[in-house]
Amino acid sequence: MRYKTLEAFIDQVAASNPGQPEFLQATTEVIESLWPFIEQHPKYAEHGLLDRLVEPERVVMFRVSWVDDRGDVHVNRGYRIQHSSAIGPYKGGIRFHPSVNLSILKFLAFEQTFKNALTTLPMGGGKGGSDFDPKGRSPGEVMRFCQAFVSELFRHVGANTDVPAGDIGVGGREVGFMAGMMKKLSNRADCVFTGKGLSFGGSLIRPEATGYGTVYFAEEMLKRVGKSFDGLRVSVSGAGNVAQYAVEKATALGAKVVTISDSSGTVVDEDGFTPEKLAVLMDVKNHHYGRVSDYAERVGATFLPQARPWHIPVDVALPCATQNELDENDAATLIKNGAICVAEGANMPSTAKAVIAFEQSKVLYAPGKASNAGGVATSGLEMSQNSMRLSWPREEVDSRLHEIMCNIHEACVAHGGNRNGKTSYVDGANIAGFVKVADAMLAQGVV
């Protein structure tokens, strides 16, 4: 092995990527998990494999100039991280949020590579976005920004090269604007974006897929300890697409979901969600672009300003908001309150110290690369439908999604070993994803 110790490799990654804490956090977590496996299988330390694995194949950064409704010109920064094409075209979402920077997108693309490998579908890993904030912008401004963004991005993506999708700040509306501009610029109607509307090539179940998939994965985790969602108390963070459909599926399976949240605070409803309450939340968030405080006022629930949901006693926690939203103090509270299971719906929502706390406890903990892979899995199914010029019924897509999540769970269990008397889903997800990507890289030579 080129690197005698794990610390030596991490130091090299840190030195090569200064000022990128999120990327360093993600790579450290994965490599720490993989190191014992690599020591037992030294072929994965040959040919500079680890160095190549943590280095993106391509980083595209560009200026996005656009005009607001008053005629003023704004300049934002756009990115596309094409991390790995070892097992297929780059695949990963586009995020519009003021926090977007190179470190965050490199971490997301790195994680996406393993997540996509876990689905077993032929998709590489990528991620993109901009520091543009769509909140408070008119539909016309959002459209003009999306068109300006794609006027550069279109040079770097394609149905067999790189297939973006939505993410935070990028929903069906934004994907539609970008897909339309892409078609105009390229004069092609290929599947260059997933997450499209049903009227122009989208897939049924795609909006629900990440939230549904997270719950399907957690359901398999609970089955291994002889439990089900029926009658369990569940906390969900976030109130966007992932959170909404996690609430819907968990409620359908008999759980009582007692929290949702956004950046303004947390709503606690001890009576639990109902389909009617969920419809109100979707109206507030998806149509009025309001806050969870508006939802609480409409349904008579309790709103806790600037609070996170993790102090509420529950059996299952589903963090579905954003990275590093759940720290070691939150983890300690969940453990103390008797939580059985934590399954991540967001990307890396638990800090490194929180993950350690969960792994050292009796709590079943699933990292996002495994438990929230349902979104990209269904994007892969959308690509398949587009390539065949078909549209599968809702039941078929949902069935395929459920099967994929069960298979990912089985792969995690197969590679997860036994840590503290339980399966380590962290090790299982990292090793299963790594083996598929690494085997492909070794087979293709040093490229």
What annotation goes with each model-predicted range?
Residues 161-165, 189-193, 236, 259-262, ...:
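General beta-strand structural signal in soluble alpha/beta enzymes
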Residues 1-205, 436-445:
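N-terminal ligand-binding/catalytic initiation module
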